Design a protein with these regions (language model features):
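Conserved strand-to-loop turn within each blade of WD40 beta-propeller repeats
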Residues: 35-36, 88-91, 143-146, 185-188, ...
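Beta-propeller domains
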Residues: 1-9, 26-66, 99-112
């Protein structure tokens, strides 16, 4: 145990990505992890909690339900729904898996459905890393070290659009802004917006972070309800808030942790709570101080607008550790209902089942 209501389990592999298996009505009892930096022995693993009991101790340690070997380091994991999950690796490959069976069933397992080999490669067929993937309805977007974006139709299982030479510096992360627009970040503190309905050589917007320091953008998150607000994490630990209606940087937030942010995620139902993890081993909860809200002021912004008001961010932002710093990179986190899971380079996964919101 590392903190109140938080449990840790050492699984013997560095965890690069972790994701809850989605559930609509109840708290999920299954999650997947992807490992990295383990030579030729990296895996996608499916884990199950023993129950949905309120007593967290009864859920831990989680049970390993299935394991699938991966060709290289796992770089991203994205669920399409509660059955299908896409996994990318540093060998330029993306695979689609189906989770068959329910938790605690003796037949639960992971089955490969489709594989897209060498989506990203250099000249002469040399494989390169698929840096990130994003999912929107029936489309899958990938970016790689070859400065290329692939758009895959999940209906046909084919690459129906490939955009090359999209950046002059390494791409770091990608997300769908809308069903027909993808947004990618690079190591020069830039974001590029692509409209998939127009000619593939035309860029919709080239958005610069107008600061003197070109700090790499390392991760990206979209506001759950106000999709035009984009949040980016930087190599120096700052969070930028962008309004994609005007392609402008509204404000920058800092927690005092100057290590690179590895992931950002909003609570899906309580968007005034955002979570981050970092290379420095901190898992943080960024929240509006509700007690400071001017309830007598009918013109006061709702909680969902808190992030984009510079004055309110400065006076009402609360940043707290979810777990005690572990001083080893925390690479990934995910939130589902009131429970959070994260994975780190110390070969451990951490679970907190009762988030304080």
């Amino acid at each position: 145990m590392v903190h109140s209501n938080t449990f840790a389990e050492f699984i013997g592999r560095k965890v690069n990505k972790v994701r809850w298996k989605p559930e609509d009505l109840m708290a999920s009892t299954m999650f997947v992890t992807g490992s990295w930096d383990n030579d030729e022995d990296n895996v996608l693993e499916l884990w199950g909690l023993s129950s949905q009991d309120e007593d967290l101790a009864k859920d831990f340690p989680p049970k390993l339900l299935d394991s699938v070997q991966q060709d290289g380091d796992v770089t991203q994991i994205r669920f399409l729904d509660n059955k299908f999950v896409a996994v990318s690796t540093d060998r330029g490959t993306v695979k689609l898996y189906r989770i068959i069976g329910e938790n605690e069933s003796p037949t639960v397992h992971i089955k490969e459905v489709t594989a897209w080999e060498e989506l990203h490669s250099f000249e002469k067929g040399q494989k390169c890393c698929c840096k990130d993937i994003a999912v929107c309805n029936y489309s899958l977007a990938t970016i790689g070290e070859d400065y290329k974006i692939n758009i895959i139709s999940l209906n046909t299982k084919q690459v129906h659009q490939a955009i090359e030479d999209v950046s002059s510096s390494p791409l770091t992360c990608i997300c769908f802004l809308t069903e027909t627009q993808v947004l990618c970040c690079n190591s020069l503190s830039q974001m590029k917006l692509w409209d998939l309905r127009v000619d593939k050589s035309d860029i919709t917007a080239d958005i610069n972070n107008f600061t003197q320091n070109q700090v790499p953008l390392t991760c990206i998150a979209q506001h759950p309800s106000q999709k035009h607000f984009i949040f980016t994490g930087s190599e120096e630990g700052d969070v930028g808030v962008w309004d994609m209606r005007t392609n402008s940087l509204l404000t920058t937030m800092s927690s005092g942790d100057t290590s690179a942010l590895t992931e950002l995620a909003f609570h899906p139902l309580e968007p005034d709570h955002m979570f981050s993890c970092s290379f420095g081993g901190r898992l943080l909860q960024w929240s509006s101080k509700k007690s400071y809200m001017c309830r007598n002021d009918p013109g006061d912004l709702e909680y969902s607008n808190f992030w984009v008001n510079t004055d309110k961010v400065k006076t009402r932002l609360s940043v707290n550790d979810v777990i005690k710093p572990i001083y080893s990179p925390i690479n990934s986190l995910d939130i589902q209902k009131q429970q959070l899971v994260c994975g780190a380079d110390n070969e451990a996964i951490y679970l907190q089942k009762h988030l304080k919101l």
